[in-house]
Amino acid sequence: MPRRREVEKRKILPDPKFQDRIVAKFVNNLMRKGKKSTGERIIYGAFDQVEAKLKDDPLKVFKKALDNVKPVVEVKSRRVGGATYQVPVEVRQDRRTALAMRWLIEYSRGRGEKTMVEKLAGEIMDAASNRGNAVKKREDTHKMAEANKAFAHYRW
């Protein structure tokens, strides 16, 4: 246990367009080299494409996509007597959201469309309908945890 006091979480201001903290956090994750305006342009462009294609509120679709990508359990390595076990542990709420955002961005960047706006829009729409690589990543994570359920008693 650390002897110093717990570090406060930084308050993230809501984004200018949707007044939503989750979108602002996503923009911060998407941003590279401090270029926030570029990150905002990408995500707002992706939201416009989602709205045009699905004729639905893009914020609602985005939140549904995030919920579909959030992992419930993950595995952590734990060394016990010379052997390393993959121990399944439950994921905290804030880490779930962070992982979901990270995976959405990672698998968006790996898609085949031409611009990042199109890639992100495609991955958001796929994730909202339980398809796509980000959802597959969550399923793989859950499978790993399920396969290593026997080591759950090593949790710390």
UniProtKB/Swiss-Prot annotation:
UniProt GO cellular component terms: small ribosomal subunit
Record's signal peptide: none
InterPro entries: Ribosomal_uS7, Ribosomal_uS7_bac/org-type, Ribosomal_uS7_CS, Ribosomal_uS7_dom, Ribosomal_uS7_dom_sf
Gene3D superfamilies: Ribosomal protein S7 domain (1.10.455.10)
Gene Ontology terms describing biological process: translation
Pfam families referenced in this protein's UniProt entry, alphabetically: Ribosomal_S7 (PF00177)
GO MF term list: rRNA binding; structural constituent of ribosome; tRNA binding
Keywords of the record: Ribonucleoprotein, Ribosomal protein, RNA-binding, rRNA-binding, tRNA-binding
Family indicated by similarity: Belongs to the universal ribosomal protein uS7 family.
Oligomer status and interactors: Part of the 30S ribosomal subunit. Contacts proteins S9 and S11.
Alphabetized NCBIfam families for the sequence: rpsG_bact
Stated role: One of the primary rRNA binding proteins, it binds directly to 16S rRNA where it nucleates assembly of the head domain of the 30S subunit. Is located at the subunit interface close to the decoding center, probably blocks exit of the E-site tRNA.
Name of the featured protein: Small ribosomal subunit protein uS7
Naturally occurring in which organism (per UniProt): Anaeromyxobacter sp. (strain K)
Lineage: Bacteria, Pseudomonadati, Myxococcota, Myxococcia, Myxococcales
